[in-house]
A protein has these predicted regions:
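Short, low-complexity N-terminal intrinsically disordered segments enriched in polar/charged residues
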Residues: 1-42, 140-141
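Low-complexity, intrinsically disordered terminal/linker segments enriched in charged
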Residues: 2-5, 124-141
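Hydrophobic pocket/interface hotspot
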Residues: 24, 35-37, 44, 56, ...
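A solvent-exposed, acidic/Ser-Thr-rich amphipathic alpha-helical stretch
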Residues: 33-90
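Short, surface-exposed coil-to-beta transition loops
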Residues: 76-78, 107-112
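A short hydrophobic beta-strand element
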Residues: 88-98
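Short, cysteine-centered beta-strand-loop-beta hairpins and adjacent loop/turn segments enriched
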Residues: 99-108
């Protein structure tokens, strides 16, 4: 039974789902993408609800790596976050604005995220957002 997990970057103990997802987001923001992926289950389901659903770390890396690589800065501003459960089985939901600085200009869009923690890893990551707003934000860059 997994009750704690170490942050792959700082090696700090993480004992609750809320802190775990917060550290996951911080790792992405700080360009610690490999460390963030260590926090994801090998068979994780990643669902960008209006676009596509993929399964497994490799597929998640394929979806995100190009987009993140094009950004000189990444900020995921969490406005609200709620969590329940523990590191064995927990759920975290957040409302956030994901921001990416691309070619000197910020591209941003609003997200509602759902993370299910199972056995100390993110087993399900689902992001809900407006596809049209996302497309328009990218077109303005």
């Amino acid at each position: 039974m997994v009750s704690v997990r170490l942050d792959p970057v700082t090696q700090q103990v993480i004992s609750d789902p809320d802190h775990f997802v917060t550290k996951f987001i911080e790792n992405i923001e700080q360009s610690h993408f490999t460390a963030a992926m260590e926090m994801v289950a090998d068979d994780c389901e990643y669902d960008n609800v209006p676009i596509t659903k993929v399964f497994g770390k490799e597929a998640i890396v394929n979806i995100l790596s190009g987009f993140l690589a094009s950004a000189s800065k990444v900020e995921w501003l969490v406005h609200h976050q709620v969590a329940s459960g523990d590191m064995q089985h927990g759920v975290v939901m957040n409302e956030r604005t994901d921001r990416f600085e691309i070619d000197g200009r910020w591209v941003e869009f609003d997200i509602a995220g759902l993370f299910v923690i199972s056995d100390g890893k993110i087993a399900l990551w689902r992001d809900y957002f407006d596809k049209e707003a996302f497309t328009k934000a990218l077109a303005k860059k």
